[in-house]
Amino acid sequence: MKDIEKLVRENILSLKPYSTARDEYQGELGVFLDANENPYANGYNRYPDPHQRALKALLSQVKGIASENIFVGNGSDEAIDLVLRIFCEPRLDNAIAIAPSYGMYKVAAQINDVELREVLLGEDFSLPTEQIKAVGEVGAQVVVA
């Protein structure tokens, strides 16, 4: 297994994480006007934690996985988009998708300017591993299924 950081695009790896006042302030929650939050407590006046710390800690405990190895997203579309955006250089890399499958793989590849190579399932819906290997030898960066 490769070290995953070696697969990440260089410009993505060098990004500085977005920081909010909430990240920097550890005391009693005040009013975060820089985040355009409502100063009046009505139950919906705060944005949720952008790092999902509490949720990841709970999932970590339940599943026995380190919280830094857990990704939480806004559904599969976001996860697919991020995988292609993080690991594939636009107009350079390609990805492999098994077909028939979820249509968002193709849409996300087009949005990220990544060539998508589709490999058809066998007639019995088995994975054509030899075809996947052959297509993957020509510079595929990601296999999505």
Where are these regions (language model features)?
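Phosphate-binding glycine-rich loop
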Residues: 56-94, 112
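N-terminal "arm"/small-domain region of PLP-dependent enzymes with the aminotransferase-like
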Residues: 1-62, 145
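Conserved beta-strand segments of alpha/beta enzyme cores
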Residues: 11, 29, 69, 115-117
